[in-house]
Amino acid sequence: MYQADEKRYETMKYHRCGASGLMLPELSLGLWHNFGDTGVYENMKQMCFTAFDNGITHFDLANNYGPQPGSAEKNFGKILREEFSAYRDELIVSTKAGYDMWPGPYGNWGSRKYLKIGRAHV
């Protein structure tokens, strides 16, 4: 299992997010094109390790990130479960909803059913 750098918070600057009190790093790691099923899983893990070791605690996803829509969330979820579980309380994971995911009336645009079904596989 991954061991984070003990000095990971020494060089990154953090700022409050609005009036929420949440502290976010100056840099985040966006997982749009780098974490789909066409990518190399070991490279995905190393990107996450390097980011976290340098104080990046915010990972940005969306339900249509891939390629193959949804695959970035799936792959990052695997990394989170297998490698980052000891650090889960130090991470901010954001996502978005509302993009086309599958055919039919419930596969797009953020309906209540879409959001409930979409969470089931993550």
What residue ranges belong to the model's regions?
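N-terminal binding-site loop/beta-alpha segment at the start of enzyme catalytic domains
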Residues: M1-I92, I117
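Conserved small/polar residues in nucleotide/adenosyl-binding loops
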Residues: A120-V122
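Structural motif corresponding to the early beta-alpha repeats
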Residues: E83-K113
